[in-house]
Amino acid sequence: MNIKKVGNVILAVKDIDKSLQFYHEIIGLPIKNQRRSWIDLGTTGALLSLHPASLTAQHVGDSIDSGITLGFLVGDVQSAVDELKEKGVTIHRDIIEKDAGKNAIILDPDGYLISLFEPIFDDKDQQTGGYQGFTPA
């Protein structure tokens, strides 16, 4: 097997319109491709793909049950949390600070956990390596 990169992360969602509003209008991810039952969001790297749960395997619980957490790097986690609170987004865990940076956890409309991470290490675009100690729950 010769995997080149992660292409997308697919979320089975209960209401694709509500999820599109959350990820596009509230979070700010641009729409890359949109079809009737599939939406790709993002610009570079892996895409976030939304697909109706009714057209996939049975939707079983939330991300705590399934172990799924989405991670977004942010420039300023405090301003991100403040903005999302104003937009009515559920803050699952407020900001904590560790050696690697600051982190908060929010919930999407289907209960998926989303980590907002502001790194303090040199490579500000680094996706991993700085999450030690940041458990979602």
Can you annotate each of these PLM segments?
Residues 1-7, 30-71, 81-107, 118-137:
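Vicinal oxygen chelate
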Residues 7-21:
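Short, basic/low-complexity N-terminal boundary segments at the transition from targeting/disordered tails
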Residues 12, 71-75:
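Short hydrophobic/aromatic beta-strand micro-patches
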Residues 18-19, 77-81:
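Short, conserved charged micro-motifs
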Residues 19-24, 84, 111:
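Conserved active-site tyrosine of GNAT-family acetyltransferases
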